[in-house]
Swiss-Prot record:
Enzyme class: hydrolase
Upper classification of the organism: Bacteria, Pseudomonadati, Spirochaetota, Spirochaetia, Leptospirales
GO molecular function: double-stranded RNA binding; metal ion binding; ribonuclease III activity; rRNA binding
Protein name, per record: Ribonuclease 3
Cited PANTHER family: RIBONUCLEASE 3 (PTHR11207:SF0), RIBONUCLEASE III (PTHR11207)
Active site location: D66, E138
Names of the cofactor(s): Mg(2+)
The species this protein was found in: Leptospira interrogans serogroup Icterohaemorrhagiae serovar Lai (strain 56601)
Reaction(s) this enzyme catalyzes, per UniProt: Endonucleolytic cleavage to 5'-phosphomonoester
The keyword rRNA-binding belongs to this UniProt entry's keyword annotation: yes
UniProt function note: Digests double-stranded RNA. Involved in the processing of primary rRNA transcript to yield the immediate precursors to the large and small rRNAs (23S and 16S). Processes some mRNAs, and tRNAs when they are encoded in the rRNA operon. Processes pre-crRNA and tracrRNA of type II CRISPR loci if present in the organism.
Stored SUPFAM superfamilies: dsRNA-binding domain-like, RNase III domain-like
Enzyme Commission number(s): 3.1.26.3
């Protein structure tokens, strides 16, 4: 059985899957011609390994989508910044196609809702969730490119990426520093960061929180914000950047 027929066979046996991808089609404003591409775009390798009827996962589409995404970003930056040199363009490009930004777009589109993931992977998935989410956007781009061509794929990408092309510094606002600090701490120190609310001031409608984050007795930083969550993010950002500079 060919790849296309096998994937279509699996797809047609699952009416819920059909409805799910129809929902995706409406959400992204693209009428699918070859639905099997989009189905495959959301098949994780762990799901393929647990289901013998699945012959292809989304890794090839992810590879293709990454290349299409890179080309679209490069073309846009080349036009937007005519005086920027190669090094400057490369630095901006790496920021706007980074995991935090692609993850934020993927979350906005709720792409994980369409993901077919193996049972074992569901249980073990933790720190790689952001990367997995970003990869889904790339595999979707790969599917759109194969199904609709470069022009439609480019329009889709720019619909979601143009704000970062216009303002690359906006990448900073989508970074989840708590997650990054946690991942770094687990990898290098084998321990989780500890957060403590140091102070809480101001009236109920305009409170300011001061939070301290610590990794062992070796590293510590503080941050403030209008909520505990934002204060923790700011403290995590301060400590993460400090550690990365010194290690």
């Amino acid at each position: 059985m060919s790849f296309k027929k096998a994937q279509s066979h699996f797809f047609l046996k699952n009416p819920e899957r059909v409805r799910s991808l129809q929902k995706l089609s409406k959400k992204i404003g693209i009428k699918f011609s070859k639905v099997e591409y989009y189905n495959t775009a959301f098949i994780h390798s762990s799901y393929k390994n647990e289901n013998q009827e699945i012959l292809e996962d989304n890794e090839r589409l992810e590879f293709l989508g990454d290349s299409v995404l890179g080309l679209v970003a490069a073309r846009s930056l080349f036009r937007k910044y005519p005086k920027a040199n190669e090094g400057e363009l490369s630095r901006i490009k790496s920021r706007i196609v980074s995991t935090p930004i692609l993850n934020s777009i993927s979350e906005k589109l709720e792409l994980s809702e369409y993901l077919l993931l193996g049972k074992g992977e569901k249980n073990s998935l933790g720190k790689g969730r952001r990367k997995l989410s970003a990869n889904l956007f790339e595999s979707l781009v790969g599917a759109i490119y194969l199904d609709q061509g470069f022009e439609i794929a480019e329009k889709f990408i720019l619909r979601h990426l143009s704000e970062f092309v216009e303002n690359p510094e906006k990448e900073e606002s989508v970074r989840d520093y708590k997650t990054q600090l946690q991942e770094y701490s687990q990898k290098h120190f084998k321990i989780l960061p500890i957060y403590r609310t140091k102070s809480e001031s101001g009236p109920d409608h305009a409170k300011t929180f001061q939070v301290v984050v610590r990794i062992r007795d070796q590293w510590e930083a503080s941050g403030s914000g209008v909520s505990k969550k934002s204060a923790e993010q700011n403290a995590a950002k301060e400590l993460y950047n400090r550690i990365r500079k010194k290690t």
